[in-house]
Amino acid sequence: MYVLLTILTSVLVCEAIIRVSLSSTREETCFGDSTNPEMIEGAWDSLREEEMPEELSCSISGIREVKTSSQELYRALKAIIAADGLNNITCHGKDPEDKISLIKGPPHKKRVGIVRCERRRDAKQIGRKTMAGIAMTVLPALAVFALAPVVFAEDPHLRNRPGKGHNYIDGMTQEDATCKPVTYAGACSSFDVLLEKGKFPLFQSYAHHRTLLEAVHDTIIAKADPPSCDLLSAHGNPCMKEKLVMKTHCPNDYQSAHHLNNDGKMASVKCPPKYELTEDCNFCRQMTGASLKKGSYPLQDLFCQSSEDDGSKLKTKMKGVCEVGVQALKKCDGQLSTAHEVVPFAVFKNSKKVYLDKLDLKTEENLLPDSFVCFEHKGQYKGTMDSGQTKRELKSFDISQCPKIGGHGSKKCTGDAAFCSAYECTAQYANAYCSHANGSGIVQIQVSGVWKKPLCVGYERVVVKRELSAKPIQRVEPCTTCITKCEPHGLVVRSTGFKISSAVACASGVCVTGSQSPSTEITLKYPGISQSSGGDIGVHMAHDDQSVSSKIVAHCPPQDPCLVHDCIVCAHGLINYQCHTALSAFVVVFVFSSIAIICLAILYRVLKCLKIAPRKVLNPLMWITAFIRWIYKKMVARVADNINQVNREIGWMEGGQLVLGNPAPIPRHAPIPRYSTYLMLLLIVSYASACSELIQASSRITTCSTEGVNTKCRLSGTALIRAGSVGAEACLMLKGVKEDQTKFLKLKTVSSELSCREGQSYWTGSFSPKCLSSRRCHLVGECHVNRCLSWRDNETSAEFSFVGESTTMRENKCFEQCGGWGCGCFNVNPSCLFVHTYLQSVRKEALRVFNCIDWVHKLTLEITDFDGSVSTIDLGASSSRFTNWGSVSLSLDAEGISGSNSFSFIESPGKGYAIVDEPFSEIPRQGFLGEIRCNSESSVLSAHESCLRAPNLISYKPMIDQLECTTNLIDPFVVFERGSLPQTRNDKTFAASKGNRGVQAFSKGSVQADLTLMFDNFEVDFVGAAVSCDAAFLNLTGCYSCNAGARVCLSITSTGTGSLSAHNKDGSLHIVLPSENGTKDQCQILHFTVPEVEEEFMYSCDGDERPLLVKGTLIAIDPFDDRREAGGESTVVNPKSGSWNFFDWFSGLMSWFGGPLKTILLICLYVALSIGLFFLLIYLGGTGLSKMWLAATKKAS
């Protein structure tokens, strides 16, 4: 880059020389070199302004000939510099005489290389250029070279300082005399450091203004009291307190550092002799053999000027800022964020340091003395130093000695046009030459909408405390003011003002959802069998309150199943006979009988009207009636014969006459069969499963051995078992050598989820732009030729480099504005409004947006091993988890869901999830979520430059000296609050998964799940001394022929910690419950297919088995539900294949009524009464209608 700058600047100078040549054919050679690297863009733009041929033919080192354009010449220049062995490049247009030749020479001393540029042009072509054209070409070229930011140290006039030019701190005796004042030839470390590249870009852009030290010596800025703090004795000193809130960096070998303090005065910190400041400028370090620099290091990037603008009544506000450094701007009671930030500041007359929310600068050129630099030559004839010199050097000249127009002066001066318009320029031999200093005009900043002239303006990196204007997303908190009621028709949740849109209720691993139009009350179905069994029910609600969502735990007491399921007309209400009274049962029979009679009557009438053999239709009915009568008579006769036979046998009746004598002797007869035939025909065996799935470890994987009274079994192999439904258990039974040696491995299905498998994701947040602007006149700073029109977004103006060096998202603009005297410029060409805009995060939190590429089923299992240890694991399809006894894997046969591509999801880490009603976009698009997206949460918080942005997000409105920048971004936090889960879309409810670890979907689906248990030489010990226990049956609640099952509760009293196992007589049913010291109630889920349960178990804790009777009545819950409801329920695991069965139900009905004969008689009685009542009502209705008809007829006649 260093050599490339030399090439470009040499070409420009060479071009200028050729243009002013009028010879027919001239060959000019120029040499150039530089010791500093340089960005080439500005010089290249000027090079393209030269009227070069559109098409060039270039020969690189004479090796190859390439065709290129002037636009591509830049690449060719880079090639000759970078490539080894390429020593020259020659380009010419269609006319071979129009040629540019660049020759790369060998390195020489400190110079990287020597470049010779040759340009040949025809005299006629040169002659077409006017002097005005020549001037417009040469001046921009010189401006590029002279005003490039990196060559400040080579511009001798930068050391021609305004005012006294003193750059030293009083009391520093070792300060070199060259700082009192700064001279052209002398070295002053306090000033020279300001010209180093990249360190103080703001001052370098306004280098002809005063430094802080110069402003102090020119009495523009006062000194602090005390003016300097010794770090070794500065404990508790106020100046040290201000220094500590600044983030600073001091180079090595500096003994002192200075800054502008909060009072608008200069303060400094210093170390004793032979000590240097450490890199953080907070400590002193002694270095042996090192020579300390004789100067003070500036801790802020600033410049100063003289001003009379009063700032005593000036009040500024920084949006959302509570404190900057030691200055408290406002009182903040909420949460604060603290960070080091680059903050602009200014100092006015009679004011303290004023921090600014943004910095808008404008410069007005003027003819004041500080706007000119005057110099003379050392050794100049009749100069102040006219003695002979060994070096060619310049010397500053006091402009006050030059006469103003209409005034008097002691010296004769000459200068440029600007100087001669304000001062008398002599036509004779002058004492000094004066010229206008570029960028030396009056600088004004905008404060509270008013342009004011500050004494000093600059940047510093300081601690800033900001209030979190937008409240962070709150975690899901319990709703302490909500009210819950366990109503018969459902669980009612009432809020205290916010409107609930959807909710999820869960109990015992079973969840149900509900959605509605936003209301302060929502009614949810009871999950599982919680309506009758009672217990805690967790409810998660989505609402329109400030918080994302709320949760509440409702406790419902156990209730009589017949009271909570009291529907008479619905299906489950009709078949729950145990819940009917005599009146309700009669109503049911009457309704069905009436419907049957009406249907038969209608059918008869229709057939009769159509004359379709009504008599023949009645014949089957008559035959059926006759057959029923015959069966009835036979049954009555048989019963009567049996009764008479019994009476005769006991002597109550003899030939139909009552015998009053001694009773006849009772003969021996066989037992009377009674109703055994009917019972055998109608007997149906019930089925139950305590451990929903139970297998016994086979001998192929079990090896047992006995050691005294103890038995040790080793398991090695694989066992396959079906997973239990939600709330139920799958058990592996391990039997020892003895009958009383039994242990179980239980896997309880705690919950089932249909979880989201995430695809692509990104992080986003809320951002706002902040823009800085500065207007510079044409040919001042970087405003030259067409630089403004060709300004690139990634190119930062030098005066904003101190802010632009951060890694935040930023862009740069340049807008051409008016020029001339009316706009404060000498040059009539357009001025340049340079803009630096950066984005900052509004909230100190970020959101993650993701999509779901698939929905997979996942089970949460609670594993109780053989020793009673409990652990909880999550298993997905085809996944495995390792345990202390081996591993367990899950195989699933299930269907997922579809239709989720039309929306995406948002996660607030640790706080919740939300749904977005738009598909996931892979690229940022304006007007959609994710206009700004980052790859990490920290990148969002810092608004890092690595984040992707949609184009043209920031809108600009330039207004001559200032600019407005605005954005219209989608706020993801508003979207998050509006779509916080749970939400219902496409008849599916989406909610946060268990533990808030993802998103799950509720759909009325089921899954077939199998568990594979793999044992790896696991040993199980059966201890000889067993624990004794007693168990008593408490209750049986729940449903039959349902997936929820029934809950069997036992009261267990044990002498220690162990387990209770129970089985029925044939060993087909097992109950396994833990036992603890003392008395404790334990419950387990079982599944039955009959409403009447009466099962005898044998239980044991120590091998001594005792009987246990489990008895109760269950009800049916919604066996037929064809209603379409939005939302859904949690996935059913291994649904029970046996549905509601009529024969099982009728068997329970007969048991309920006391036997089959009594059941048939009661049914017949109810049917007969219903038919009689029906015809009675028909008769009464017909009679009443007839009387009414007759009365109406008589009245009409």
UniProtKB/Swiss-Prot annotation:
Q: Which cysteines are joined by disulfide bonds?
A: 179-188, 229-239, 250-281, 271-284, 304-456, 322-332, 374-434, 402-413, 420-425, 479-482, 486-556, 506-511, 691-731, 704-713, 756-852, 771-965, 777-825, 783-832, 788-814, 818-823, 934-947, 1029-1101, 1039-1042, 1049-1083
Gene encoding the protein: GP
Lumenal-side stretches of the chain, per the record, are 154-582, 691-1159
**Positions marked as site (Important for glycoprotein C and glycoprotein N subcellular location):** 1194
- Its protein name is Envelopment polyprotein
Which Gene Ontology BP terms does the record give?
entry receptor-mediated virion attachment to host cell; fusion of virus membrane with host endosome membrane; symbiont entry into host cell; symbiont-mediated perturbation of host apoptosis; symbiont-mediated suppression of host apoptosis
Entry keyword Membrane: yes
Record region (Important for correct targeting of the glycoproteins to the Golgi complex but not for heterodimerization)? 646-650
Q: Which family does it belong to?
A: Belongs to the phlebovirus envelope glycoprotein family.
Q: Where is this region: Fusion loop?
A: 777-783, 819-830
Residue ranges spanning the membrane: these are 583-603, 1160-1180
Leader sequence segment: 1-16
Ordered alphabetically, the record's keywords are: Disulfide bond, Fusion of virus membrane with host endosomal membrane, Fusion of virus membrane with host membrane, Glycoprotein, Host endoplasmic reticulum, Host Golgi apparatus, Host membrane, Host mitochondrion, Host mitochondrion outer membrane, Host-virus interaction, Membrane, Modulation of host cell apoptosis by virus, Signal, Transmembrane, Transmembrane helix, Viral attachment to host cell, Viral attachment to host entry receptor, Viral penetration into host cytoplasm, Virion, Virus entry into host cell
Q: Which residues lie on this side of the membrane: Cytoplasmic?
A: 17-130, 604-673, 1181-1197
Where are the stretches annotated Internal signal sequence for glycoprotein N?
131-153
Q: Which region ranges are annotated with the description Golgi retention signal?
A: 608-650
The record, for InterPro entries, names:
M_polyprot_prcur_phlebovir, Phlebo_G2_C, Phlebovirus_G1, Phlebovirus_G2_fusion, Phlebovirus_NSM
Give Gene Ontology CC terms: host cell endoplasmic reticulum membrane; host cell Golgi membrane; host cell mitochondrial outer membrane; membrane; virion membrane
- Region (Internal signal sequence for glycoprotein C) residue ranges read 675-690
Q: Where is this site: Cleavage?
A: 153-154, 690-691
Q: Where do the record's glycosylation annotations fall on this chain?
A: 794, 1035, 1077
